[in-house]
Amino acid sequence: MGEKQRKLLVLYASQTGNALDAAERIGREAERRGLPASVVSTDEFDTSSLPHHEEAVVFVVSTTGQGDSPDSFKAFWRFLLQRNLGNYWLQQVRYAVFGLGDSGYQKYNFVAKKLDKRLSDLGATTIIEKGLGDDQHPSGYEGTLDPWMLSLWRTLYQINPKYFPKGPDVKIPQDEVIDKPKYRILFHKQEKLEPKLLSDSDIIQRARGMSPGKLFKDKSKPDCFLKMTRNEVLTKAESTKDVRHFEFQFVSSTIEYEVGDVVELLPSQNSSVVDAFIERCGLDPESFITVGPRETENSSFSEEMITQIPIKLKTFVELTMDVTSASPRRYFFEIMSFYATAEHEKERLQYFASPEGRDDLYNYNQKERRSILEVLEDFPSVQIPFDWLVQLVPPLKPRAFSISSSPLAHPAAVHLTVSIVSWITPYKRTRKGLCSSWLASLAPEQEVNIPVWFHKGSLPAPSQSLPLILVGPGTGCAPFRGFIAERAVQAQSSPVAPVMFFFGCRNKDTDFLYRDFWESHAREGGMLSEGKGGGFYTAFSRDQPKKVYVQHKIREMSKRVWDLLCDGAAVYVAGSSTKMPCDVMSAFEDIVSEETGGGSKEVASRWLKALEKTGRYNVEAWS
């Protein structure tokens, strides 16, 4: 009796969709080599069954923020941490880990690294060294994924040739196989639809509830709507940046929030671009559709689609498909090649989708930040069916911002501090951030209701008795404006702990965000006054020949910082995710080392890690 067919299990944990894309690509590449593969999210997998997967298991996990794991990974990870599992629980399992992260962050690919160690501790055997995809790589995470996959296939073949009966490098040609789209679109005759009066919230919930993937499963319906009441430029005309102060009021319902919370806004797409996309795809914007997973051998979703209320196609595109700003992923070009009728377009698309064309695709697509519409216009012979477009067009994602107001100081209002994103591509094309440029274009008198979701960020609201050391260069000052405003209100009726704040920007005269606010609180008797035990310290990096940053100012105030830490202060850091968080941490390590009598950096690092574990060192960084 012959040996049973080998299989590959690919488990992924994704927050933004990149890990899902990578996992599906691994699954597709395995099947093209004759190895059946199942691709499953960690939150849909029975973790207790993992020891029974004696064949190969590949884990694809992303790391977000400062070493945070995706929401879909948390329950899976808690299960693996159970002490009763023992060192031999996974002794039959062979595994490989591929991580997606950004080396600009201090805890680069932290989730993949800790998963790899835990699997090994539980007795599993690694197939190959873990792969670490890096957003900073010229080709993104795929720059690491391509050679890592090649090594994976060849190592599996060495372990057991049954994995690839024809060899690890023999693939079914791309032009001979095409997957079925995962989603099915039903078009409805308008005359058969019953008219329903729906609120904006219901329409958004309906559209995003049909949207592919698990990215929106817990937040299809907005928490509420906001209306802009103020749009103020904070930077001077001479500045190289455009930073705005926005104020909003609640529409119909009010949501309670705390300082340090984050609000996500769903931006509006340019209606003319949406119309052009729909026309380019040969679709009727007024048609009504329902969207649902395609039926498979093991499951039927027809009942789910029957219970859905149809939605207008244009509304669905506007609310769920980012056709105006996001660049398509590599798989989009592969599917395009199947539908190209012009031979030269087909060849170009196949090249872009191949490992050999990866760098050229990156230069054409990601570096230029080409939109879906621009790519489709560059290949006019391609006519992709709408079910494929629903699957492949990047989802329209809410954009997250740190709230810069306090509910105590600014009742029934939400304030945001937003840098308006704009850049020039290598081919000298001006590109703008979708959400920030849209917000900048709004006038307070416009009746635009913005759908929003509130949630906790990485900066927990501090009690008024907790001393604070705040570090917020640039727009990193946003959450701390709320912190200071709230503590100033609290101080009117009861004692509050002191606050030190370190702010930085390029130029004092052009980029000093909220200057009057900070300086008023730094005066005698103010929340940031040294007389109250606090302080306000500024670093203007370009105002002198030698650049000065917040970490330099922190070191200058070494004694006062240490005294406040000894009094139980918590450190809060917010701002750019590039070098700043690491440089600030290094400054605190120097202070701890110096003030404790010249101890080593390693001892200081452990001391600060203890602060992190007890919630006294918090970082919120963004790219």
From Swiss-Prot:
Binding, NADP(+): 475, 541-542, 547-551, 583
EC numbers on record: 1.18.1.-
GO MF annotations in UniProt: flavin adenine dinucleotide binding; FMN binding; NADP binding; NADPH-hemoprotein reductase activity; oxidoreductase activity, acting on NAD(P)H
Keyword set, alphabetical order: Cytoplasm, FAD, Flavoprotein, FMN, NADP, Nucleus, Oxidoreductase
Effect of a null allele: Embryonic lethality when homozygous. Embryo development arrested at 2 to 4-cell stages.
GO-annotated cellular components: cytoplasm; nucleus
Protein known as: NADPH-dependent diflavin oxidoreductase 1
Pfam families: FAD_binding_1, Flavodoxin_1, NAD_binding_1
Residues where FMN binds: 14-19, 62-65, 135
Role description: NADPH-dependent reductase which is a central component of the cytosolic iron-sulfur (Fe-S) protein assembly (CIA) machinery. Transfers electrons from NADPH via its FAD and FMN prosthetic groups to the [2Fe-2S] cluster of the anamorsin/DRE2 homolog, another key component of the CIA machinery. In turn, this reduced cluster provides electrons for assembly of cytosolic iron-sulfur cluster proteins. Catalyzes the NADP-dependent reduction of cytochrome c, but not cytochrome P450 in vitro. Required for embryo development.
Coiled-coil features, chain-numbered ranges: none
Localization terms from the record: Cytoplasm; Nucleus
Gene3D superfamilies: 3.40.50.360, NADPH-cytochrome p450 Reductase, Chain A, domain 3, Nucleotide-binding domain of ferredoxin-NADP reductase (FNR) module, Translation factors
Required cofactor(s): FAD; FMN
Reactions accelerated catalytically: 2 oxidized [2Fe-2S]-[protein] + NADPH = 2 reduced [2Fe-2S]-[protein] + NADP(+) + H(+)
Record text on subunit structure and interactions: Interacts with At5g18400.
Residues covered by the FAD-binding FR-type domain: 221-467
Tissue: Widely expressed.
List of residues binding FAD: 369, 399-402, 433-436, 622
Keyword Electron transport among record annotations: no
InterPro entries noted in UniProt: CysJ-like_FAD-binding, FAD-bd_FR_type, Flavdoxin-like, Flavodoxin/NO_synth, Flavoprot_Pyr_Nucl_cyt_Rdtase, Flavoprotein-like_sf, FNR_nucleotide-bd, NADPH_Cyt_P450_Rdtase_alpha
Residue span(s) of domain Flavodoxin-like: 8-153
Family indicated by similarity: Belongs to the NADPH-dependent diflavin oxidoreductase NDOR1 family. In the N-terminal section; belongs to the flavodoxin family.
